[in-house]
């Protein structure tokens, strides 16, 4: 079997397992990079000819370790590549398409995860003040979207997937039909957020919650561009993504409650290890405060 056919079979399995489009796309990118490296080094793409030595050589190559501009990738990026290869070839071995997993010897490098880049409170004020002063329906939509991420901790994809009927403002809830892992979840809304969303929704009873002038649901890419433009116009110098709003929600909730399990529930993390990164941020805040005394 050729590598390209194996990649297609692996992606079909990921889809059947309910893996998110983001996860599938990352696996596809890593597998495609391996294919390009095999072609460049004139190695066979036949699975029968692909062993652990070839995979080790690929992971050690500039294609795997450097960006297109030649700058070295972060250790976390290379670790993600190793994980993708182990998962891909583990599937091929389990499916009987290879006699064994040639990537089983690839080990993840030890590294600390980078701290989450959260929207600071002063940046939040600048951003919301800018949007409040902007005229037009698009600014009202952007403001509501950002508040939903800031006050409820939604991922941008989950927020944009909401329809108007998914909001139960009387119960202060939003019913997220498709989150990162295709799980149906109930998200709790603060009284302030409920009032803002009530004004934003108005008399609408159907359709996408966040729609463009044509009435169609806006895309994640469009929302990301709008967010970047608003950040720049608000005078915020740091480069931030919409996910900084979700990070801000978690960081502030932990600072307020000190309860990591509560934050895990609010963030809808399956594992507490995904939430623990915010505890490291909170500890650094304490150190900074002590140094300032």
Q: Residue spans of the language-model regions?
A:
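Conserved catalytic core of the tyrosine transesterase superfamily
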Residues: 1-293
């Amino acid at each position: 079997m050729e590598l390209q056919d194996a990649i297609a079979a692996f992606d079909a399995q990921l889809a059947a397992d309910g893996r998110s489009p983001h996860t599938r796309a990352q696996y596809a990118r890593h597998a495609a990079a391996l294919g390009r490296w095999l072609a460049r080094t004139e190695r066979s793409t036949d699975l029968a000819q692909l062993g652990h030595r070839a995979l080790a050589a690929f992971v050690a190559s500039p294609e795997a370790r450097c960006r297109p501009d030649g700058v070295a990738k972060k250790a976390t990026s290379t670790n993600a590549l190793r994980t993708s290869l182990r998962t891909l070839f583990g599937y091929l071995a389990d499916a009987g398409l290879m006699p064994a997993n040639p990537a089983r010897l690839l080990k993840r490098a030890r590294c600390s995860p980078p701290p989450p880049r959260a929207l600071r409170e002063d940046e939040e004020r600048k951003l919301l003040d800018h949007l409040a002063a902007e005229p037009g329906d698009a600014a009202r939509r952007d403001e509501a979207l950002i508040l939903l991420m800031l006050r409820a901790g939604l991922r941008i994809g989950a927020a944009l997937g909401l329809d108007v009927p998914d909001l139960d403002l009387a119960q202060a809830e939003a019913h997220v039909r498709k989150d990162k892992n295709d799980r149906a979840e109930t998200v709790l809304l603060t009284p302030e957020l409920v009032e803002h969303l009530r004004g934003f929704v108005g008399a609408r009873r159907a359709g996408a919650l966040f729609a463009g002038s044509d009435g169609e649901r806006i895309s994640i890419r469009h929302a990301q561009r709008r967010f970047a433009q608003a950040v720049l116009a608000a005078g915020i110098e740091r480069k931030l993504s919409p996910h900084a709003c979700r990070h801000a929600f978690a960081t502030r909730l932990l600072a307020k409650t000190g309860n990591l399990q509560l934050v895990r529930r609010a963030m809808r993390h399956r594992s507490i290890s995904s939430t623990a990164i915010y505890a490291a941020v909170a500890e650094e805040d304490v150190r900074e405060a002590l140094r300032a005394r």
